[in-house]
Amino acid sequence: SPFTINLAVALCVNPVETYVKIKVGDEKFILAEALVETNFPDTEYEVVEKYVGTDLEYKEYEPLFNFVTPDKKAYYVTCDSYVTLTDGTGIVHIAPAFGEDDANVGRKYNLPFVQLVDGKGEMTKETPWAGTFCKDVDKEILVNLEERGQLFNAPKFEHSYPFCWRCDTPLIYYARDTWFIKMTDVKDD
């Protein structure tokens, strides 16, 4: 979901796949080698460098959005085998507060937990979209990136998405701090 782009604290590549830095005109791009032709059809390009995913691990990057200062090291490349080369660039953004794969990578790399969506599902005051339901800012985020010249592509993907069975509103994966009591340790026999 585009709304999680502004919550991303890392990028993730597949550790064993091949990635390339290519030059197209005056611009350079890093993406999975297997996806170059898909992303640059009928385009002349020069391969400047080749990498295995692990070569990119811990390389730092400049975030697209930086509404808060994370309390831990952020904005670097991580590796995980869940990243596939079926579409996109072979590089995914990681927002540990939104999604099981992202949360797992976040724990593995000790990434900061950035939560800019409140308990009602609305963007918080740190963002320009304060008070707006997070799914309603998807288009605005893409427009913002395009206006700044930072949107490479935004293809429409058809995939299943969870909706509330009662009111038909989109559901969001929302991680929050919780605690549990192991009652078997405190219960009298």
What are these regions (language model features)?
Residues 171:
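Cys/His-rich microdomains that often coordinate metals
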Residues 133-161:
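Phosphate/diphosphate-binding loops
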Residues 49, 53-58, 129-139, 147:
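A glycine-biased structural micro-motif
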Residues 158, 176-180:
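Short cysteine/histidine-rich zinc-coordinating motifs and their immediately flanking basic loops
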Residues 167:
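Short Cys/His-rich metal-coordination motifs, predominantly Zn2+-binding knuckles/fingers
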Residues 2-120, 186-189:
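NTP-handling and nucleic-acid-processing catalytic cores
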Residues 91-93, 125-134:
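The substrate-binding groove and active-site-proximal loops of carbohydrate-active enzymes
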Residues 164:
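Short cysteine-rich clusters marking metal-coordination/redox-active sites
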